[in-house]
Amino acid sequence: MATRARLPVLVVLTITLAAAVSCGTCPPVPSITALSPSSATAGGSQFLLTVSGNDFRRDSMVSWNNSFRVTTFTSSRRLVATVTATDIAQPGTVLVFVFNLPEGGTTFVSGGIGLVSTTACRGKSSNAVSFTINP
C-alpha cells in the first residue's frame, strides 16, 4: 500500500491594481485662450497654427473644423498644428478646439474604506474658438 504524504499548500493571494487605476479626479479639461494667427486669407499657403491655453498634454490633438490635425506638443500651455492650404481654400469660419485623449480608459477611484466612488474618465474637449478665413 502506497503512503501519501501531505504537503502543505500555500495559497498566495495577489492583488494587483492596474496602472489605469489611480486616486484622485479625472484630468482637467483643456482650454484655449488664443490662436496665432487668428485668421488667414482664402487660397493661402499651408501654415503652423499656434494654440495657446491650459491643461494641454503630450497626447492632445488640435481639431480643425471637426478634423484632427498633425499636432506638436510644446508645453502644457502651447500646441502647434499644421493647417493645410486645402483647409483654407474657401472663405468662412472654422471652429478650433483641443481634445485630450482618454488615458487608456482610466478609472479614478476615491473614497475611504467602505466608501468608494469611481469615475470613468473619457476624452475631454476644450472650448471652441473661431478661426476666420477671409476672402
How should these model regions be labeled?
Residues M1-S22:
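Sec-dependent bacterial lipoprotein signal peptides
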Residues L10-I15, P28, S39, T84:
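Generic detector of short alpha-helix boundary/capping microenvironments
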Residues C23-W64, R69, P91-T93, G104-P135:
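Beta-strand/beta-sandwich contexts
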Residues V70-S75:
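Short beta-strand segments within Ig-like beta-sandwich modules, predominantly Fibronectin type-III
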Residues R77-A81:
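Short strand-edge motifs at loop-to-beta-strand transitions and within beta-strands
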Residues T82-Q90:
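Short, surface-exposed loop/turn segments at beta-strand-coil junctions that are enriched for proline
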Residues L95-N100:
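Extracellular recognition modules
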